[in-house]
Amino acid sequence: MAVARTGVLGVQWLQRASWNMMPLGARTASHMTKDMFPGPYPRTPEERAAAAKKYNMRVEDYEPYPDDGMGYGDYPKLPDRSQHERDPWYSWDQPDLRLNWGEPMHWHLDMFNRNRVDTSPIPVSWNVMCMQLFGFLAFMIFMCWVGEVYPVYQPVGPKQYPYNNLYLERGGDPSKEPERVVHYEI
C-alpha cells in the first residue's frame, strides 16, 4: 500500500514539475481546427457550392440542415442510415466505422455506429413477428391449461409391504395366522 501511494505521489510531482516545461501531448493534439467546425449557413448558390466542396460532396447531393438555430451551420444533412447498411467487404480506410478519409460523417454518428441503432431493413415484418410471438405464447398457455385439466401420472400398482403385508403393524390379531400375500416381481 505504501509503495502504491509513493508511486502515485511521484507521478503527481512529476506532472506538476514538468507542466511549465512542456504541454501534455494529448492536450495539444485534441483541439479542433477551424476547418473541423461547420461554417455559417449557406445563403447563396456560391456559398452552397463552396460548402459542398468543403465536405467533398457534389452540389446536387449537398443539402445542409435547416437553419433553425441549433448550430448545424453548413454541415450536410446525410441520410439517417446506420453503419450496418454499408458494404462490409469494401476496403474502407476506417473499417470499424466503415468510413473513408475525407468522407463527411453523420452529425449523429455516435447514434448510428455499428454497436448502437441498426436501421437496416428487417427480413420479417413486425406484424409477422408479433403474430409468431403471440401465437407461440397462446399455444403454450393452451398446453398448460390442457395439462392442468387432464393430468398425466405414471401408472402404479397397489402398494406392497413386506412381512405379510405388515399384518401386526396394521392392527392384525397376533393369535391368528395372516393370509398369504403373493408379491409379484416386475
From Swiss-Prot:
Localization, UniProt: Mitochondrion inner membrane
Keywords: Electron transport, Membrane, Mitochondrion, Mitochondrion inner membrane, Respiratory chain, Transit peptide, Transmembrane, Transmembrane helix, Transport
Signal sequence bounds: none
Transit peptide, from-to: 1-28
Membrane topology type: Single-pass membrane protein
Domain of life: Eukaryota
InterPro entries per record: NDUFB8, Ndufb8_metazoa
UniProt key word Electron transport: yes
Membrane-spanning residues: 133-153
GO biological process, one term: mitochondrial electron transport, NADH to ubiquinone
Primary location class: mitochondrion
Chain coiled-coil ranges: none
Cellular-component GO terms for this entry: mitochondrial inner membrane; respiratory chain complex I
Family: Belongs to the complex I NDUFB8 subunit family.
PANTHER family: NADH DEHYDROGENASE [UBIQUINONE] 1 BETA SUBCOMPLEX SUBUNIT 8, MITOCHONDRIAL, NADH-UBIQUINONE OXIDOREDUCTASE ASHI SUBUNIT
Oligomeric form and interacting partners: Complex I is composed of 45 different subunits.
Function: Accessory subunit of the mitochondrial membrane respiratory chain NADH dehydrogenase (Complex I), that is believed not to be involved in catalysis. Complex I functions in the transfer of electrons from NADH to the respiratory chain. The immediate electron acceptor for the enzyme is believed to be ubiquinone.
Protein name: NADH dehydrogenase [ubiquinone] 1 beta subcomplex subunit 8, mitochondrial
Organism this protein belongs to: Pongo pygmaeus (Bornean orangutan)
Source taxonomy: Eukaryota, Metazoa, Chordata, Craniata, Vertebrata
